[in-house]
Amino acid sequence: MVGTRPEAIKLLSVIRALDASAYYEPLVVSTGQHYKMVQDILDLAGIACEVTLWSGSRQANLNARVASVMERFEDFCAERFEVHSDRTPNEEDVLQGRFPAAVIVHGDTSSAMAAALSAFHKGIPVMHVEAGLRTGDIRSPFPEEMN
């Protein structure tokens, strides 16, 4: 899950390592936060983006953007995988590609928080890269430090 150019750059090696593995089939999902910049980085690396979750107006407020990412991720999971709230996946579901093994998010952006929360609500394990870096000031940077 990538939202910003720095996230895309930092996750390239993770995406490539997963792609080289015999055990995983990484699907790159963009939250749409920095759509063009993320797409440019992925294009340079030869990595395809499966879906962009938010393509709304840049004038939309933060709550609307977070809600859009969460709703679109839920829709994507229901369409691409057998992710439904009425059943618990098992190991066979993951091995057969019917359920994601995990969602990897990076950093402290609101789009990363939205994607992680949506995955958590669907029972998908969340791996958080670069978690825990703090400034100690809840208002700076805003809203990332609160996320």
Model region roles, listed by residue range:
Residues 23-72, 76:
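Conserved nucleotide-sugar phosphate-binding/catalytic loop shared by glycosyltransferases and other
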Residues 14-26:
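A short, Lys/Arg-enriched amphipathic alpha-helix followed by its capping loop at the start of a domain
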